[in-house]
Regions:
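Hydrophobic alpha-helical segments
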Residues: 1-353
Length: 353
């Protein structure tokens, strides 16, 4: 077990909730191992997670990458890579910075990867962001058995500010229409045979049934198995959806927030952030933690200490998992171009900071 896994073992339900998707993406993904490791190393560098860098560098050496290539990852996609490897690293940069895979990267990757592999690419990059956020926030140290550390002769250069470009007006991957469902897809989307409406997100991810199942386990854990209150969870999810520019995620969770009793003004103030006057000190700290996780890929000591006055270890772990998990979902929704169902709530007219 890695140090991150041993840390998560302090809260076993979380380990079980995250395990199936992590295992799929790391061990069964349809993306080549080298492409995964290039993305993972690049994301670990961008997130400044030395624990993840050390682990992935160890794996990279096992598949033939050497000192030069591993160091070169820190230099980014323009550090002398060939066309394909540069595309993979650029995709990692975009997913991290913009929560979105650009048209150019999508088109380039589609020359080699099919729809299921593209799903795996997007979620693999987002998974490495999630793991790095957790390792940073929990203070996980590099394992002694992984000797690599960050290259000391490469200066860390933060990427330019995240793009505010408009999201896709058409889906890159369309939801599967009911008349085209296979038996396997029907068992995933409508196992009881009720004929009810299926969200566009689910009908899109069902294009990859092998991936759909472990992802559903993680989603169910965050939504129903974690230790956070409904209100705390929805504040976190709405805020990270807003920060990532995922209108679909925002829209779906506005509906959830309404069902659990949050008012329209409270939902609006999630977009305003921690400075809105209506929040309790604790709720402002939740929003602040989300902002820190999005912008710095970790929770500051001050915010962690403040949250620790109310949250126990399991809740602190679940707080980070919730934000990181829905950052992953936002990246996927944006990159797939998943469109809102008719009549659903849109983003509020609130200036972005």
């Amino acid at each position: 077990a890695t140090n991150l896994q041993l840390t998560l073992a302090r809260h076993p339900p979380a380990l079980h909730g995250l395990g199936p998707l992590s295992n799929y993406l790391r061990r069964q993904s349809m993306v080549t191992v080298v492409d995964q490791l290039l993305m993972g190393l690049r994301v670990a560098w961008l997130c400044q997670s030395e624990a993840m860098w050390a682990e992935l560098a160890f794996e990279a050496r096992a598949v033939g990458l050497g000192d030069r290539e591993i160091r070169q990852v820190a230099g980014g996609p323009d550090a002398g890579w060939g066309d394909w490897d540069g595309t993979v690293l650029r995709a990692a940069d975009e997913i991290y910075r913009d929560s979105f895979l650009s048209d150019d990267s999508w088109q380039r990757m589609a020359t080699r990867y099919d729809a299921q592999q593209l799903l795996d690419v997007i979620f693999s990059g987002a998974e490495f962001i999630m793991l790095s956020m957790m390792a940073n926030s929990f203070g996980v140290q590099p394992d002694d058995r992984f000797p690599d550390r960050f290259p000391v002769d490469v200066e860390y250069q933060p990427l330019m500010a995240r793009s505010a470009s408009a999201r896709l007006s058409e889906a890159r991957l369309e939801p599967i229409e009911r008349e085209d469902w296979s038996t396997e897809v029907r068992e995933l989307l409508d196992p009881a045979g009720t004929g009810g409406a299926v969200l566009n997100l689910y009908a899109t991810l069902a294009r990859h049934p092998t991936f759909f199942r472990p992802r559903a386990v993680q989603s169910a854990y965050i939504r129903t198995g974690a230790t956070l209150s409904d209100r705390d969870r929805e504040i976190l999810i709405l805020r990270i959806g807003w920060l990532c520019g995922s209108e679909y995620e925002w829209s779906q969770h506005v509906r959830v927030a309404r069902r659990i009793g949050m008012s329209a003004d409270e939902i609006l103030d999630v977009a305003v952030g921690a400075t809105a006057s209506r929040w309790s000190r604790f709720e402002a700290d939740l929003l602040r933690a989300t902002d820190e996780l999005h912008h710095q890929d970790t929770v500051s000591d001050a915010t962690w200490s403040a949250l620790s006055n109310r949250y126990d270890t399991g809740q602190l772990i679940d707080m980070v998992i919730t934000v990181a998990g829905y950052r992953m979902v936002s990246i996927a929704l944006n990159s797939l171009g998943t469109q809102l169902e008719p009549g659903r709530p849109r983003f509020p007219d609130v200036a972005r900071q």
